[in-house]
From Swiss-Prot:
Binding residue positions for Mn(2+) 3: 820, 832
A single BP term in Gene Ontology: 'de novo' UMP biosynthetic process
PROSITE patterns: ATP_GRASP, CPSASE_1, CPSASE_2, MGS
Lineage: Bacteria, Bacillati, Bacillota, Bacilli, Lactobacillales
Associated pathway: Amino-acid biosynthesis; L-arginine biosynthesis; carbamoyl phosphate from bicarbonate: step 1/1; Pyrimidine metabolism; UMP biosynthesis via de novo pathway; (S)-dihydroorotate from bicarbonate: step 1/3
NCBIfam families recorded: CPSaseII_lrg, PRK05294.1, PRK12815.1
Any one annotated GO CC term: cytoplasm
Protein name, per record: Carbamoyl phosphate synthase large chain
Organism annotation: Streptococcus pyogenes serotype M18 (strain MGAS8232)
Keywords, ordered alphabetically: Amino-acid biosynthesis, Arginine biosynthesis, ATP-binding, Ligase, Magnesium, Manganese, Metal-binding, Nucleotide-binding, Pyrimidine biosynthesis, Repeat
């Protein structure tokens, strides 16, 4: 069927900021879809609030609106643009929920706008728990015994009838938000109450728990002619009961018989046909390990996290083809872009095993609740490909960047058997490592299967890995044992550890016996047809399918899995760098391990290696490809940390040289450079042990800011006020980076700002200065940033620009550089310099129109700023005001304190732009879901050192109609100063404490600060948690509250008696 001619203009709804449950996979899907629609000649309008994406680049759509994804703003854009149709299925849950809201508000009918891909009825049937249940019954598809509830009492009655455990699934939420497994009435009441609150339709499904069944997923496609196929089937290592986003997943399925596979495949195709979905769909099923009994768990009527994984696992571009199906094309008339000869109707066949392991944020949140359940907690994921399961699993383990090179954590060797068994039964994010430790201690896989319900097949693979370890221990320097270990995915580092040698010895031994990996192509057809894709994975076999081309090549290292501190911003820079390399006439090669991102789309680069970002794996690619050089600037700390070892091995690092990277990272060298350049910095010293740190703090004077060197995202950074706190910090935080010393700095409580600069070594372009709303002490990634600066004098801006130029030239920076400053009493101090792309590059590129990563790459390849037509110095400022605001995922992370400090906690960002600061702030707050009522009750609970400042805010809140409430100490201070506040009770005072008031809807906002030391007391954390759980705006920095107040004041009329 030919594409539709009756529509010309299509609006695509993006997925908004990155949060847990909705990450970079939607940037990948949205980018693919927009380009596919443009390719077919449609005019594409994109709406998204996230500036950190490739999707929001000008060339991706005809018109791009970076605006809040709220009904108010999307409605305005629709009325302005008048699209013929909207494609909502590529924006995750956000896109689907927005489509439903537009329909319910009558906007789609009013303007005669059609929904493409998935009809409203299908979204409703898949997402509304009652309608889904009815549909499954009509199709004769089994679902667990369940009921729909709208109150907690209804849930309790049903559970009493069918017995515990039960699962709670809120309707229309993402990543299992608000859901969970309940083993008791108390748990059921708590989880259902929260789930009803988080469901936009106040509805939860309560169902009989089938925890322990195998969890299987089918990624299916269907077109308007009712052609349907299975793109990929996947099997979770963990049984039902753990969210699939938090499970280790293998593709294709590993333990199903042919009969089971056909049975579940038929069910999946029956469901997509019944829903009449045109595009991609994900079906999750539970299979009884001991019979042919199965249940349908849920259906996602859209492109999802699993679609991105299935696309990368098979090479089949689901989002691209789904977009074309949405405009009428059919599977039997579209060519599969991988083979270039077969049609998209051919089901992909895999002659390899793919492993996905989630990446969790618990290295950042040590006190977070790590136990896994039906609510997702992972921030990102890694994928690895191998010829056997062991190989793909071990490659994925070393891709995680959590300090392991194998499925082994050495720290676990010290724990008791009792603790080990507990951790094996109660699944946490690191259960794989506990299982492997149990096998090393001699627990049988049958025992472990009965404790965990993990299939014996998977446990046997873990046992096989342990057997190879034992074989290596018994046969040191034995070539056949080495060959076997490499065939099953063991790293040189692990083998060296077992043989008590250096990694370089193993590498030398391999090379002396010509034992090197070959690279196989991902071709969707198990080599049945010729494929043209430059998409490769390594394995230890005979035939190499990756041939070095005659063209000079450049290798760009990606940034690995998405985690807090290193998000999609770095992937954005990687993709732009590749474009510039190709324009310069080189072959661009990407190496990365993240299946969610645009950089691992095989059509982006000339060659893609889906490999772990370790020294060994990178060197193997370099040995084969012999690139002209390697670019490490765009891969965040992941790539920077590899620069030294690659350089030592004789690899050419392009751009800023390793010794200059070191001068920015090494404290003593950096101090020396600043002295030579005449640039002030807060007084500071380096310490390698407790005594030195205490001596440094005594000399500098408390409070001090302490942190390890060579870290990203403020990892283990803290402000300490006295000796005891400093001792405690040294005992707990040095783990963060043991081979590097601790930095002890004078803490300056001033205004912070940051600069991204691009240098060719002689000239320096500064696209803009970003002013932070929150003062020093809040991590830059968690601060709201304003461009152009609103409160910095011309002189201060000139000083910042001058210091930046001196630094870039003095540190021999070629390419990107990020500098952070603090300003106090009109004095500018440098806090830190990062000689690489930073997380603000996409934001600043969008608001200034300067393609920063592309320019930096051209300079790295030898051009000058003058060649490219750019002047030296600060670029002319934008006429609009732009705000970058952080977005947090605290609702998904129980027991993680939402108090902001020097360690980064945000998972994503949004942008607000307008003609004034107030309007831009309003948009930013709307986009990051901080909706504040125009009046109501606001609670102040304030530390002594900021009560005076809070008082003036409270007076302003009162002037616009807010009722002021306060805790005892704060209320007393306010009263002394002539402002009366309603007293709220102490925690535990059931009728009147803050959590109770919040729960009953009597509080519209909370302002809570904890003083310079930032040690969170238990009461404070309970107050903050109650605000997060109930969705009440919470301000832990007075500057953020002040910004919100500015917005409210600008929206209020002045009402005064004459």
């Amino acid at each position: 069927m030919p594409k539709r001619k009756d529509i010309q203009k299509i609006m695509v709804i993006g997925s908004g900021p990155i949060i847990i449950g909705q990450a970079a996979e939607f940037d990948y899907a949205g980018t693919q879809a927009c380009l596919a629609l443009k390719e077919e000649g449609y005019k594409v309008i994109l709406v998204n609030s996230n500036p950190a994406t490739i999707m929001t680049d000008k060339e991706i759509a005809d018109k791009i609106y970076i605006e809040p994804l709220t009904l108010e703003f999307v409605n305005r854009i629709i009325r302005k643009e008048r699209p013929d149709a909207i494609l909502p299925t590529l924006g995750g849950q956000t896109g689907l929920n927005m489509a439903m809201a537009l329909s319910k508000a009558g906007i789609l009918d009013d303007l005669e706008i059609e929904l493409l891909g998935t009809k409203l009825s299908a979204i409703d049937q898949a997402e509304d728990r009652d309608l889904f249940k009815q549909l499954m019954q009509e199709l004769d598809q089994p679902i667990p015994e369940s009921t729909i509830v709208k109150t907690v009492d209804e849930a309790v009655t049903f559970a009493r009838d069918i017995g515990y455990p039960v699962i709670v699934r809120p309707a229309f939420t993402l990543g299992g938000t608000g859901g969970g497994i309940c083993s008791s009435e108390e748990e059921l009441c708590e989880i259902t109450e929260n789930g009803l609150k988080l469901s936009p339709v106040t509805q939860c499904l309560i169902e009989r728990s089938i925890a322990g069944f195998k969890e299987i997923e089918y990624e299916v496609m269907r077109d308007s002619a009712d052609n349907a196929l299975v793109v990929c089937n996947m099997e979770n290592f963990d049984p039902v009961g753990i969210h699939t986003g938090d499970s280790i997943v293998f593709a294709p399925t590993q333990t199903l018989s042919d009969i089971e596979n056909q049975m579940l495949r038929d069910a999946s195709l029956k469901i997509i046909r019944a829903l009449k979905i045109e595009g991609g769909c994900n079906v999750q099923l539970a299979l009884d390990p001991y019979s042919f009994k199965y249940y349908v768990i849920e259906v996602n009527p859209r492109v999802s996290r699993s679609s991105a994984l299935a696309s990368k696992a098979t090479g089949y571009p689901i989002a691209k083809l789904a977009a074309k199906i949405a405009v009428g094309l059919t599977l039997d008339e579209m060519i599969n872009p991988i083979t270039g000869t077969t049609y998209a109707m051919f089901e992909p066949a895999l002659d390899y095993v793919v492993a996905k392991i989630p990446r969790f944020p618990f290295d950042k949140f040590e006190h977070g609740e790590r136990q896994l359940g039906t609510q997702m907690k992972a921030t990102g994921e890694v994928m690895a490909i191998g010829r056997n399961l062991e190989e793909s699993l071990l490659k994925a383990c070393r891709s995680l960047e959590i300090g392991v090179c194998h499925n082994e954590m050495t720290s676990l060797s010290n724990i008791s058997d009792e603790e080990l068994v507990t951790k094996v039964i109660k699944a946490q994010d690191d259960r794989l490592f506990y299982l492997s430790e149990a096998i090393r201690r001699g627990y049988s896989i049958e025992e472990l299967e009965s404790l965990t319900k993990i299939d014996l097949f998977f446990l046997d693979k873990l046992l096989h890995i342990v057997e190879i370890e034992q074989e290596l221990q018994m046969h040191v320097d034995h070539l056949e044992s080495l060959k076997k270990a490499k065939r099953y995915g063991f790293s040189d580092q692990k083998i060296a550890e077992i043989w008590q040698k250096d990694e370089s010895d193993i590498r030398a031994m391999r090379h002396s016996h010509s034992l090197c990996p070959v690279y196989k192509m991902v071709d969707t057809c198990a080599a049945e047809f010729d494929a043209k894709t430059p998409y490769f994975y390594s394995t230890y076999e005979l035939e190499n399918e990756s041939v070095q081309s005659n063209k000079e090549s450049i290798l760009v290292l990606g940034s690995g899995p998405i985690r807090i501190g290193q998000g999609v911003e770095f992937d954005y820079a990687t993709v732009h760098s590749v474009k510039a390399i190709q324009k310069a006439g080189y072959e661009a090669i990407i190496m990365n391990s993240n299946p969610e991102t645009v950089s691992t789309d095989f059509s982006v680069s000339d060659k893609l290696y889906f490999e772990p970002l370790t020294f060994e794996d990178v060197m193997n690619v370099i040995d084969l490809e012999q690139p002209k050089g390697v670019i490490v600037q765009f891969g965040g700390q992941t790539a920077i940390n590899l620069a030294q070892s690659l350089s030592d091995a004789g690899v050419t690092i392009l751009g800023t040289q390793v010794e200059d990277l070191d001068r920015a990272e090494d404290r003593d060298l950096f101090e020396k450079a600043l002295k030579e350049l005449g640039i002030p910095q807060p007084q500071g010293q380096t310490a390698t042990n407790e005594e030195e740190a205490l001596e440094a703090a005594k000399k500098i004077g408390f409070p001090v800011l302490v942190r390890p060197s060579y870290v990203l995202g403020g990892r283990a950074m803290e402000i300490v006020e006295n000796k005891e706190d400093l001792r405690e910090y040294i005992r707990t935080a040095v783990k963060a980076s043991p081979e590097h010393p601790i930095l002890v700095d004078s803490y300056i409580f001033g205004k912070e700002c940051e600069v991204d600069a691009i240098s060719d070594g002689k000239s320096v372009l500064i696209p803009g200065i970003m002013e932070h709303i929150e003062r020093a002490g809040v991590h830059s990634g968690d601060s709201m940033a304003v461009y152009p600066p609103q409160q910095l004098s011309k002189q201060i801006q000139e000083t910042i620009a001058e210091y930046t130029k001196r630094l870039a030239i003095g540190l021999n920076c070629i390419g990107m550089m990020n500098v952070q400053f603090v300003i106090k009493n009109e004095q500018v101090y440098v806090i830190e310099v990062n000689p690489r792309a930073s997380r603000t590059v996409p934001f600043l590129s969008k608001v200034t129109g300067i393609p920063m990563a592309q320019i930096a790459t051209k300079l790295i390849l030898g051009q000058t700023l003058k060649d490219l037509g750019y002047e030296d110095g600060l670029y002319p400022q934008s006429q609009l005001v732009h705000i970058k605001a952080p977005v947090f995922s605290f609702t998904k992370l129980a027991q993680v304190d939402s108090l902001l400090g020097p360690e980064m906690k945000s998972t994503g960002e949004v942008m607000g732009s307008d003609t004034s600061l107030e309007k831009a702030l309003y948009k930013a707050f709307e986009a990051n879901n901080s909706h504040l009522s125009e009046f109501g009750q606001i609670v102040f609970t304030i530390a002594d050192d900021s009560k005076a400042e809070a008082l003036s805010l409270a007076r302003r809140f009162k002037a616009i109609g807010y009722q002021i409430m306060a805790t005892q100490g704060t209320a007393a201070y306010f009263a002394e100063q002539g402002l009366s506040a309603c007293l709220v009770g102490k925690i535990g005072d059931a009728a009147n404490d803050i959590p109770t008031l919040v729960r009953h809807g009597h509080v519209q906002a909370i302002v809570n600060t904890v003083g310079i030391k930032r040690t969170a007391d238990k009461d404070g954390q309970m107050i903050r948690s109650s605000a997060i759980e109930q969705g009440v705006p919470l301000f832990t920095a007075l500057d953020t509250a002040k910004a919100m107040l500015t917005v409210l004041e600008s929206r209020c009329f002045n009402i005064e008696a004459i």
